[in-house]
């Protein structure tokens, strides 16, 4: 989560409203923050009263940064907050959580760009479909699945269609809160 060490380069102000949306649903919730970077979603959820935060990122530096940011926001002082972290490939980590039978009230999936070139768009859409499938297996019934795409080459309607197609294949009815 720094220009020198990661794909993502810091705090993304364009996600400010989305972090607030997640926080609005986080009181007493269990929250999975996938591709967590500096933990913007995790920190907001913790500050709003989440009971469990589980972060996943490929970068050990990012996971350390989440801990630093939680401490800076005094979230770690809450005795009722459990913080778990996984350093590793997000797809593999999510699959392991599925195998372990884990479920969360809120699942946040905010990956780096999957389509640096136009030729990568089909692969990126398949990755979003796979993330949706995993997210649906990890979110509790009635929970919040939050997905984002920062791939400028992915048309918003194609992204939404991909998410909804996977939900249909899984037999899950989605209710969009916000686009």
Across the structure, where does each feature detected by a protein language model lie?
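SAM-dependent Rossmann-like transferase core, predominantly class I methyltransferases
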Residues: 1-29
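Conserved class I S-adenosyl-L-methionine
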Residues: 28-37
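Mobile active-site "lid"/loop adjacent to the S-adenosyl-L-methionine
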Residues: 104-134
């Amino acid at each position: 989560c720094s220009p020198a060490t990661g794909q993502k380069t810091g705090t993304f102000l364009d996600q400010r409203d989305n972090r607030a949306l997640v926080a609005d649903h986080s009181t007493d919730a269990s929250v999975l923050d996938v591709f967590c970077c500096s933990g913007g979603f995790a920190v907001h959820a913790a500050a709003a009263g989440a009971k469990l935060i589980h972060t996943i990122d490929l970068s050990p530096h990012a996971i350390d940064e989440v801990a630093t940011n939680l401490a800076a926001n005094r979230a770690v002082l809450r005795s009722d907050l459990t913080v778990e972290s996984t350093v590793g490939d997000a797809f593999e980590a999510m699959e392991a959580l599925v195998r372990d039978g884990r479920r969360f009230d809120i699942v946040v999936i905010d990956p780096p760009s999957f389509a640096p070139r136009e030729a990568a768009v089909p692969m990126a859409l398949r990755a979003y479909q796979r993330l949706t499938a995993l997210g649906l297996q990890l979110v509790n019934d009635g929970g919040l699945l939050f997905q984002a795409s920062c791939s400028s080459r992915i048309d918003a309607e194609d992204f939404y269609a991909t998410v909804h197609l996977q939900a249909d294949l899984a037999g899950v009815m989605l209710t969009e809160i916000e686009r």
